[in-house]
């Protein structure tokens, strides 16, 4: 029997690219695919397109329309909460605007079985309207607490075993109200998995073409403008406050390492800087993380 996949796709004003994305999902080789779509209230006809697709293709299920989520994370939390568990071996996430390689799922299954893991993600091949392409590498070796401070790559590369997805769904259902304050679903899903002892593998082989455009909610940090925007999120407290919130929601707030920094005081930020090697995967990010923590500690001291 072919592996059975349920793909959770979050859409919003997606008419420009959703057809190409859906075609690449439904064309996955040597697996059985069912596609579950949730549409954030749109103005470009996305709901009608999805409804028509679901009416003519039994592999496609549309969740009821009419909800305004205001962001991809809330849409994905809704998808996780409402996803049917029966009849599926694996569960995957999808954006509305990428293009998947035909062997994306067969490779994921092979890696999951070979590595004996419950969570899978991968590098991606990012591409821009001007024809530029670049491999985005997220497969640096995992460290003790990277999951509290970053995702395992783009969420559209994530694949969960039934065992992991069942546990994740139970968590999302029980924490649904609190999760509305979490901005990045892929970060949270990775954090939940690692915090609860599930093994995860980040594949160095890209399985998809990751489209970059002006409407990306979260994309590749490319250029000075994007870097400044990310830096502003760090200095206004969003980043570490999200880390603290995620640590609490995945049940790690009482862990000694987390207790040392979760209140984000000046001394705690210095401690966090000294532990940067355990907080980020990429060597450069370890140094940047330490520097940012020290700068934030200095800012708090001046206040």
Where are these regions (language model features)?
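Short beta-strand/loop segment that forms part of the nucleotide-sugar
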Residues: 9, 33-41, 63-65
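Short, well-formed alpha-helical segments that are part of the catalytic scaffolds
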Residues: 14-27, 49
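A conserved acidic beta->alpha catalytic loop
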Residues: 39-49, 69
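Glycine-rich, basic loop-to-helix element that forms the pyrophosphate-binding segment
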Residues: 66-85
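Short beta-strand-to-loop acidic/aromatic patch adjacent to the donor-nucleotide binding site
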Residues: 88-97
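Acidic donor-binding loop at a coil-to-helix junction in glycosyltransferase catalytic cores
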Residues: 178-191
């Amino acid at each position: 029997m072919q592996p059975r996949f349920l793909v959770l796709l979050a859409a919003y004003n997606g008419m420009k690219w959703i057809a190409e994305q859906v075609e690449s999902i439904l064309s996955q080789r040597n697996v059985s695919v069912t596609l579950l779509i949730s549409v954030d209230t749109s103005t470009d006809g996305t709901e009608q397109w999805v409804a028509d697709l679901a009416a003519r293709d039994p592999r496609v299920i549309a969740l009821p329309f009419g909800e305004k989520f205001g962001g991809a994370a809330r849409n994905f939390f809704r998808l996780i909460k409402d996803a049917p568990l029966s009849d599926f071996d694996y569960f995957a996430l999808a954006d509305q605007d990428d293009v998947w390689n035909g062997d994306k799922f067969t490779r994921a299954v092979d890696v999951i079985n070979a590595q004996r893991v419950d969570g899978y993600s991968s590098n991606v091949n990012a591409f821009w309207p001007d024809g530029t392409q670049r491999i985005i590498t997220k497969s640096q070796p995992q460290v003790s607490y990277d999951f509290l401070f970053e995702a395992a790559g783009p969420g559209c590369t994530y694949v969960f075993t039934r065992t992991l997805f069942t546990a994740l769904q139970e968590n999302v259902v029980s924490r649904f109200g609190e999760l509305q304050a979490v901005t990045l679903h892929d970060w949270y899903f990775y954090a939940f998995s690692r915090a609860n002892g599930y093994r995860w593998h980040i594949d160095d082989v890209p399985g998809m073409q990751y489209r970059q455009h002006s409407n990306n909610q979260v994309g590749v940090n490319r250029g000075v403008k994007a870097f400044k925007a990310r830096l502003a999120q760090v200095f206004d407290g969003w980043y570490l406050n999200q880390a603290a919130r995620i640590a609490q929601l995945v049940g790690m707030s009482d862990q000694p390492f987390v207790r040392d920094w979760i209140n984000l005081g000046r001394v705690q930020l210095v401690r966090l800087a000294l532990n940067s090697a355990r907080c980020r995967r990429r060597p450069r990010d370890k140094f940047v993380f330490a520097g940012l923590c020290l700068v934030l500690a200095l800012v708090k001291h001046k206040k």
